[in-house]
């Protein structure tokens, strides 16, 4: 049996339960809409400035917050582009920042704070 280079679902669930990060990859050869990339993922309940700093330093891409439609509507987010022409059709909203408890909005602390505030079901 060929050994996989990928973690099992069970292993990823254990990582999430331990407040850990994992890399979620897609495969362009399976779907033409895929970007053939990996994303660092962590639970919003676990994210802290150290995680944000790690993402910014090592992944060097956008730091995004995945959110369901109900929560995004609840906090008043709208799509950045109502007619999405991108290949992946990713539903990006405008950039956000917490109203309170942040300074410039760009620091790892401010970004982690914004994620915590935006993902709070009582927001």
Roles of regions detected by a PLM:
Residues 1-123:
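Catalytic domains of riboflavin
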């Amino acid at each position: 049996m060929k050994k996989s280079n990928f973690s099992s679902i069970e292993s990823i669930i254990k990582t999430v339960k331990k407040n850990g990060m994992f890399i979620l990859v897609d495969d362009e050869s399976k779907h033409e809409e895929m970007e053939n990339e990996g994303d660092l993922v962590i639970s919003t309940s676990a994210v802290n400035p150290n995680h944000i700093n790690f993402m910014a330093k090592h992944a060097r891409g956008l730091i995004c917050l995945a959110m369901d439609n109900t929560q995004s509507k609840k906090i008043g987010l709208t799509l950045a582009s109502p007619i999405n022409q991108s290949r992946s059709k990713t539903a990006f909203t405008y950039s956000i920042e917490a109203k309170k408890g942040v300074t410039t909005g760009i620091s790892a602390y401010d970004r982690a704070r914004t994620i915590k505030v935006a993902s709070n079901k009582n927001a």
